[in-house]
Each structure stands twice: as structure tokens, then as C-alpha cells.
UniProtKB/Swiss-Prot annotation:
A GO CC annotation given for this chain: plasma membrane
Chain positions of motif NPA 1: 105-107
Protein name according to UniProt: Aquaporin PIP2-3
InterPro entries cross-referenced by the UniProt entry: Aquaporin-like (IPR023271), Aquaporin_transptr (IPR034294), MIP (IPR000425), MIP_CS (IPR022357)
Residues with PTM N-acetylmethionine: 1
Compartment list: Cell membrane
Biased composition (Basic and acidic residues): 1-17
Length: 285
């Protein structure tokens, strides 16, 4: 909540007060169409995200497979894959931010839930929609390119040879921390009020964070940082290796999101103590 005031540098700025935290459990939300519209938006966005990105991964493997007539440097490469993931997040967050918040990732939803930005009901429904959307998105890839999908790994996440479990888990924790920390920073209403004279396009830094994390972690885990993305690919590909390593792509992102949420709320923002107090008061009701 803010009102326009004159800043010391002559810019128009805003006098700001933190909005109240979202109720922990809001049963009334279930009666509102806006909730279901947002859930549908999350489902469709995650479906499109997985469809385009998994197609990109498989296309790169086809074009770089020398046994199938490809060339060593064929296809988009790791850089192109990173652009595909980051670019799709930029596009989809831009399209859905005004409807659902543009989460497209259970780890992002979980982090925002911990910070009291979304209710428990909304968080659970979002995560279910994201996982179902991911399954459908990868399912479309397999339906349209069945032989290539099976032969080239199905875009599934697993720990690469030469890396131990600790390295893979750390990559997922740190990568998700970067993403969720960026989400909090880009969408911080206090920042928007303070820097109201600076046009900010929140999806841009979020998409760029995804791009940068993919460059760093594709060689290690194929880059999860999104449990729905890893889950959808594992369900449709359904091989032992992705399932054996699958826990990494839930535990790592959720730990990373938790650290990012608490760092932003309790270290960077003075509102952290208020959020903790609201959690305690909600538990005593």
C-alpha cells in the first residue's frame, strides 16, 4: 500500500506500508473463480514450458548425435537449451503474472507460501496443477516424437556420471536459491514503491536467473530447480535412473526455496518478525 510523495531527489516516489500477510488457511478462497482461473493458468503455463523445453533438449541431442548423421557441434548446444528454459520462463511469467502470479514451479510456490504471499490452499492447488501440467507437456512431446523421445532420454533429470549425490544436491539447492531469491527481489512491493520512477519488468530478471542457473548446472544434473519439471519428465520417461535420483529434484529445490524465503523476509526485510508473529497467531487460533 502506497501513496505518491515527492522524493529528495525530485523524483516522484511512494510512502510505503507492507501489505498484511495472506491468511495461512482461507477456506473462502475455494468459492472464488479467481482461484480456479489461476490454477488453470498454472497448469497451462507449465504444460507449455515442458513441451517447448523438452523438445529443445531432444532436438539438440538428435542434431549432435554423430551416429545418426549429426555433427559434434550440431544443434543449439547447452547455451541454446539454457536460453530455451530462461526464455520460456520470461514469456510465461509475463503472460500469467497478473492471473496466478506466474509461479510455474512448486519451489517458487513453496517459497512464497513460507513468506505468507499465498495461502496453503492456493499453494497446494498450484503445485498439483504444475505437476499435472508438466506430465501433460512431456506427454505431448512423447506422443509427437515417440522414437526420438525414447532414444534421447526424454529430457529427464538425473545425476551425471562423475558427480556424487552431494554435488548434485548442492547444485539444486544453490540454483533454486538464486531463482527464488530473484523472484522475491523482482516482485518486492517495497522495491516497486521506492523505485516507482524506474520501469521494471519483473519477468526479465526471473527468466535471466533461470538462464544463468542452467548454464552452471546442466552438466551436473541437467538442471532441475523445478520439481514439476523433473517429475513430469520422470513420469513419462519412466526409467530407473531418473527415479533413483528423483528425490534430489524435490529436496534440493525445496531447501533452496526455504533458504531464499527466510533470507529475504528475515534478513533483508524488516517485516520478517511480523510474518513470524502472524504464523504464531494463526497456529493459536
Amino acid at each position: 500500500m502506497a501513496k505518491d510523495v515527492e522524493g529528495p531527489d525530485g523524483f516522484q516516489t511512494r510512502d510505503y506500508e507492507d501489505p498484511p500477510p495472506t491468511p495461512f488457511f482461507d477456506a473462502e478462497e475455494l468459492t472464488k473463480w479467481s482461484l480456479y482461473r489461476a490454477v488453470i493458468a498454472e497448469f497451462v503455463a507449465t504444460l507449455l514450458f515442458l513441451y517447448v523445453t523438452v523438445l529443445t533438449v531432444i532436438g539438440y541431442k538428435i542434431q549432435s548425435d554423430t551416429k545418426a548423421g549429426g555433427v559434434d557441434c550440431g544443434g543449439v548446444g547447452i547455451l541454446g537449451i539454457a536460453w530455451a528454459f530462461g526464455g520460456m520462463i520470461f514469456i510465461l511469467v509475463y503472460c500469467t503474472a497478473g492471473i496466478s502470479g506466474g509461479h510455474i514451479n512448486p519451489a517458487v510456490t513453496f517459497g512464497l507460501f513460507l513468506a505468507r504471499k499465498v495461502s496453503l490452499i492456493r499453494a497446494v492447488l498450484y503445485m498439483v496443477a504444475q505437476c499435472l501440467g508438466a506430465i501433460c507437456g512431456v506427454g505431448f512431446v512423447k506422443a509427437f516424437q515417440s522414437s526420438h523421445y525414447v532414444n534421447y532420454g526424454g529430457g529427464a533429470n538425473f545425476l551425471a556420471d562423475g558427480y556424487n549425490t552431494g554435488t548434485g544436491l548442492a547444485a539444486e539447492i544453490i540454483g533454486t536459491f538464486v531463482l527464488v531469491y530473484t523472484v522475491f527481489s523482482a516482485t518486492d512491493p517495497k522495491r516497486n514503491a521506492r523505485d516507482s520512477h524506474v520501469p521494471v519488468l519483473a519477468p526479465l530478471p526471473i527468466g535471466f536467473a533461470v538462464f544463468m542457473v542452467h548454464l552452471a548446472t546442466i552438466p551436473i544434473t541437467g538442471t532441475g530447480i523445478n520439481p514439476a519439471r523433473s517429475f513430469g519428465a520422470a513420469v513419462i520417461f519412466n526409467k530407473s535412473k531418473p527415479w533413483d535420483d528423483h528425490w534430489i529434484f524435490w529436496v534440493g529445490p525445496f531447501i533452496g526455496a526455504t533458504i531464499a524465503a527466510f533470507y529475504h523476509q528475515f534478513v533483508l526485510r524488516a517485516s520478517g518478525s511480523k510474518s513470524l508473529g502472524s504464523f504464531r497467531s494463526a497456529a493459536n487460533v
